[in-house]
Amino acid sequence: MPVFEASSIQSVVLHRVGNKATEEGYVLSTEPLHLTEQLQDVLVRYFLGPFKVEEYYRLYSDDGVEMNPLYRHCADIFSDPECLMESSCDIARLLYDASTHANIKGGELFVVYFSGCMFNGETMDAIGLFKSETKESFLKVLHGDEEWSRAESDAIATARYELEVQQGINPAKLDRGAIIFNTEAEKGYVVSVVDATNRTVDALYWKDAFLSVRQREDEYYNTHTEMQAYKKFVTDELPQQFEGVSKADQADMLNRCSNYFKQNDNFDLQTFTQEVIAQPEVIDSFKEYREQYQQEYDVQMPESYDISESAVKKQARAYKSVIKLDKNFHIYVHGNRELIEQGEDEKGKYYKVYFKEES
């Protein structure tokens, strides 16, 4: 995980970028922002606070990373931080050209140069790109001149108060952001991405059209991809290839996979298949599916690598083993497969569950 405890803003430029599809245009700043100490503290928390996941990307282009325009601008800035102002204007134009979906909201683009960022134990500079699209209402208290008087030992003042509704940015809610660390430049740098609005299809413009990134092939990537592929194999492929595979069987296989990744520091395909799958014919089926998965999704899946704890925690949500019975019951399977039996009688299908204590 990146560490930002010693990070500080060296320079920040603010532009307004609208929606190109609706011809909103963009407004470029003429100079960097002047930051007070208080504003610096607020902005550092606003910009860097959301970056807590160890999932990283690289700037990318099919024709070579040098053909990614954002990569070229970042390289210029890292080479000469004094050109941040000029390059930030070009970056704002790039974002405008990428904002072609009708649902994309206009907003403020912050282009920031940081120092003191730590990645993999090394301190380095970084470039931050942050877009604020959502405005929130807040109340501002207004009061007139105060008239002071003294009653006994208390100083008392009277004034006329009013409330005014204003619109502004909530510094606790970053809409979209990217941090480009000044390392591994020849591979497209190391990029961390935040997109709080990624529930809609048009949100892909931030990662794909503007940043143009691909996931960095590291331990997080390997762990995430492996667990994703195995879950898809168990839930989709296994029932088609082998008769009699029940939901309880699938839940048990997912639990064993989850436990393997939680209990080991390293992944080894041979050990994994023997401990988690065990049955030779199912092992062969999984290995064949694994090869097909890499081709279909254009991913690389090495046979051994270090396991990422944060990737395991994220995948744990998708690995919840739940058997849904009509609309009446949900059975959550966490452990011993031998304690749950499936059958059928004249009343219908049923599950029999053994337990020691009820709570």
What are these regions (language model features)?
Residues M1, V111, Y351-F355:
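Short low-polarity hydrophobic stretches
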Residues P2-Q315:
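Long, hydrophobic alpha/beta structural blocks
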Residues I283, K287-S359:
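C-terminal, beta-strand-rich globular interaction domains
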